[in-house]
């Protein structure tokens, strides 16, 4: 997980555009997010996932800004190497988790560890990486709102 403090303007614009495409999604309202909060939340997740690096590649095989796994990208019908499609897939997948689990923290845990792990543990799994991921994203998110 990379966490630089700022993204290049072109990347910020792509992340903002991806978030804006889904600003009226029912899961956003159900979680209590305004469009501004959703945008800050999505930016924060991308910051932690990839450090805003289009070419980010994890040892597990996750790719791009939203760090999509190949199987998830196929499921979503996106090319994970294309930054616009990667972000679109990441936004949709995060919204699926938000809709399924109802809270920002559980959605992040499901995005990181998989929805099966969140169901199995009935909450954030006890994996250090996942707990750190959720903590980092939420801290950056809260900071973006101030």
Where on the chain are the PLM-derived regions?
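Catalytic glycan-binding domains that act on GlcNAc-containing polysaccharides
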Residues: 1-146
